[in-house]
Amino acid sequence: MNLGINYDRILNKAKYKYVIPIIAAKRAETLKNLDELKGITEKKDYVSIALKELENGKIQVKNSALLDSLSK
């Protein structure tokens, strides 16, 4: 399943390349938990879905000011 994820577009929104996998993993975990609560047992690629949501701006980086201060 290729969702056509453009990592450069994600980098423009998140700035820090090491934050992107953390955000995607947390969102993927949330998506999986939501599906389990709904009783959906279908296998999905939750990380790809989360990366696509990040690319499309559906999820955003919280505390970007804190990240900026830590990087200095």
Curated annotation (Swiss-Prot):
Q: Which UniProt keywords apply?
A: DNA-directed RNA polymerase, Nucleotidyltransferase, Transcription, Transferase
Sorted alphabetically, which Pfam families does this protein's record hold?
Answer: RNA_pol_Rpb6
Q: What is its EC number?
A: 2.7.7.6
Biological process annotations from GO? DNA-templated transcription
One CC-aspect GO term: DNA-directed RNA polymerase complex
Catalysed reactions, semicolon-separated: RNA(n) + a ribonucleoside 5'-triphosphate = RNA(n+1) + diphosphate
In its UniProt record, a GO molecular function of this protein is: DNA-directed RNA polymerase activity
Q: What class of enzyme is it?
A: transferase
What quaternary structure, including any partners, is listed in this protein's UniProt entry? The RNAP catalytic core consists of 2 alpha, 1 beta, 1 beta' and 1 omega subunit. When a sigma factor is associated with the core the holoenzyme is formed, which can initiate transcription.
**HAMAP family recorded for this chain?**
RNApol_bact_RpoZ
Family (UniProt): Belongs to the RNA polymerase subunit omega family.
User: Its function?
Assistant: Promotes RNA polymerase assembly. Latches the N- and C-terminal regions of the beta' subunit thereby facilitating its interaction with the beta and alpha subunits.
Instruction: State what protein this is by name.
Output: DNA-directed RNA polymerase subunit omega
Which organism is this entry from? Petrotoga mobilis (strain DSM 10674 / SJ95)
Gene that encodes it: rpoZ
